[in-house]
Amino acid sequence: MNSVDIGRYKRIINYLWDPEPRNDLPDEPIWCLGIRYPPNHRGWKTQDQDGSAQGQYEQKTIPTEKANEHQWPEEFLDDVESRIWITYRSNFTPIPKPPNQEANPAMTLTVHLRSQLMDSQGFTSDTGWGCMIRSGQSLLANAMLILLLGRDWRRGTEAGKEAQLLHQFADHPEAPFSIHRFVQHGAEFCNKYPGEWFGPSATARCIQALVAQQGSSELRVYITDDTADIYEDKFARIAQAEHGDFIPTLILVGTRLGIDHVTPAYWDALKEALQLPQSVGIAGGRPSASHYFIGVHGQYLFYLDPHHTRPASLHQDVNDTLTHEEVNTYHTRRLRRIHIKDMDPSMLIGFIIRSREDWTDWKTRILSGRGNSIVHILSEDTANHQARKEAIDEVEALDD
């Protein structure tokens, strides 16, 4: 009997149920991580970008070209394809199970059955539970990509540097930002274990810790500890090196902008967060799941979906580099979007601050934003804020 290509039929079903969106808002500009693509298909794109070594901002315009069959500008699709997209993986080095996890109520039934029947020695796939980790990895990877190659980088250049960066996220225990490292830190410090769904708060704490473990002078991480408050004195301490130089700093705002859905009063500020030149996207924000949001069009947000299981890299040695085919699995031109009213309110919002001038620019934009602010900038931490730890992680685990 001939084998049946189940994957082919699954792709057909997914296409029928989730067709690629068309540009049905031709009069609305399109945004992708701070870059604006105008509504006309032949026009200009604008970007607020670092125009000098001191970080002074100036506006630059670049002509756009033709649109594709769904009427999206090709330059916009090139931008989307150049973002790093990290998804579920399978057949990686097992992540050991904790000895007392046999009946863990935080684990979904599907994940529990899979762990008993297929991954009895440990988790060799994160399908069904790792989507928030993957979204967080995507956010961190794109922040690092911007620092390494610049916001204007597009696929087809600097392939060696891109592959080296991606290898830091490979699915083996030695990779500094692997899912193994996330799970290890989550178990030790965040009360999150293999097979459990991580929330935005735990993901932010893992990112901060894993970056700190590298001891790099190229990136630091500021997290808001489950509030929307950012303190200038605390940020300055984190972002300043011993010799006084500014170290690029990733700001992670873990927040909840409503109860079941994002409160409409926050819509404008949430969309503007993805329009800022410092934006590196949003992780979370989808009921019972997590996605990596990178763009805005009208009331819709574009996202990269981590819920696609791919084989882990065969290159497990820390000194290996990924092949061209493996690098391709970290990119897609396939657009997906969701109306802002359908977003889950629990999310992790990221901004990369590259210089003191960048900080001043970002702060000015935040303070002058529309609608209810999703970030509050205060001069110093004078109060002992004790946010409820569980609030930011109360998103139902994905069961698939």
UniProtKB/Swiss-Prot annotation:
GO cellular component: cytosol; mitochondrion; nucleus; phagophore assembly site
Top EC group: hydrolase
Primary localization: cytoplasm
InterPro entries, A to Z: Papain-like_cys_pep_sf, Peptidase_C54, Peptidase_C54_cat
Catalytic residues (positions): C131 (nucleophile), D305, H307
Superkingdom, taxonomy of origin: Eukaryota
Keywords from the named record: Autophagy, Cytoplasm, Hydrolase, Nucleus, Protease, Protein transport, Thiol protease, Transport
Pfam families in alphabetical order: Peptidase_C54 (PF03416)
GO biological process terms, semicolon-separated: aggrephagy; autophagosome assembly; mitophagy; piecemeal microautophagy of the nucleus; protein processing; protein targeting to membrane; protein transport
Enzyme Commission no: 3.4.22.-
Disulphide bridges, residue numbers: none
GO molecular function: cysteine-type endopeptidase activity; protein-phosphatidylethanolamide deconjugating activity
Localisation: Cytoplasm; Nucleus; Preautophagosomal structure
Catalysis: reaction(s): [protein]-C-terminal L-amino acid-glycyl-phosphatidylethanolamide + H2O = [protein]-C-terminal L-amino acid-glycine + a 1,2-diacyl-sn-glycero-3-phosphoethanolamine
PANTHER family found in the cross-reference section: CYSTEINE PROTEASE, CYSTEINE PROTEASE ATG4
Function recorded in the entry: Cysteine protease that plays a key role in cytoplasm to vacuole transport (Cvt) and autophagy by mediating both proteolytic activation and delipidation of ATG8. Required for selective autophagic degradation of the nucleus (nucleophagy) as well as for mitophagy which contributes to regulate mitochondrial quantity and quality by eliminating the mitochondria to a basal level to fulfill cellular energy requirements and preventing excess ROS production. The protease activity is required for proteolytic activation of ATG8: cleaves the C-terminal amino acid of ATG8 to reveal a C-terminal glycine.
Family named by the database record: Belongs to the peptidase C54 family.
Annotated protein name in UniProt: Probable cysteine protease atg4
